[in-house]
């Protein structure tokens, strides 16, 4: 434990907190327009074609958002809403596109965890 004199000479430094989702600007979600919809491959032990979209947000930021679930209807100029949440095996993808909102349709034939994928209750 440092002495009072040591603390006067060199005070304690509070570590700087880095914002993980800067483009949201402290909002829960942001609206944007897809500028490019494409697939990309994940980092090393995994292998797949992950669906992602480049989105220009209303605040001018351009971010990459992950499209969750099986199948989607997004194309260029689709209006989407993004939320925070990175995809661990896709470098640079720090946002998720919310399904079942604006131009994004929910996942078809989804029985479980439906609210996460914008799917209506099956009859």
Swiss-Prot record:
The keyword Ribonucleoprotein applies. The modification 3-methylthioaspartic acid is found at residue 89. The keyword RNA-binding applies. CDD domains: Ribosomal_S12 (cd03368). InterPro entries: NA-bd_OB-fold, Ribosomal_uS12, Ribosomal_uS12_bac. Keywords: Methylation, Ribonucleoprotein, Ribosomal protein, RNA-binding, rRNA-binding, tRNA-binding. One of its GO terms (molecular function) is tRNA binding. GO terms for biological process: translation. With S4 and S5 plays an important role in translational accuracy. Part of the 30S ribosomal subunit. Contacts proteins S8 and S17. May interact with IF1 in the 30S initiation complex. Belongs to the universal ribosomal protein uS12 family. This is Small ribosomal subunit protein uS12. It comes from Bartonella bacilliformis (strain ATCC 35685 / KC583 / Herrer 020/F12,63).
């Amino acid at each position: 434990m440092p002495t009072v004199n040591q603390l006067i000479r060199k005070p304690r430094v509070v570590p700087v907190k880095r914002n993980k989702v800067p483009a949201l600007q402290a909002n829960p979600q942001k609206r944007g327009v897809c500028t490019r919809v494409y697939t990309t491959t994940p980092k090393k032990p995994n292998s797949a074609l992950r669906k992602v979209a480049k989105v220009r947000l209303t605040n001018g930021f351009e971010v990459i958002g992950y499209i969750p679930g099986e199948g989607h209807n997004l194309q260029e100029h689709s209006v989407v809403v993004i939320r925070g949440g990175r995809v661990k095996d896709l470098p640079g993808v720090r946002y998720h596109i919310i399904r079942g909102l604006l131009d994004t349709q929910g996942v078809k034939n989804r029985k479980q965890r439906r609210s996460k994928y914008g799917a209506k209750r099956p009859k």
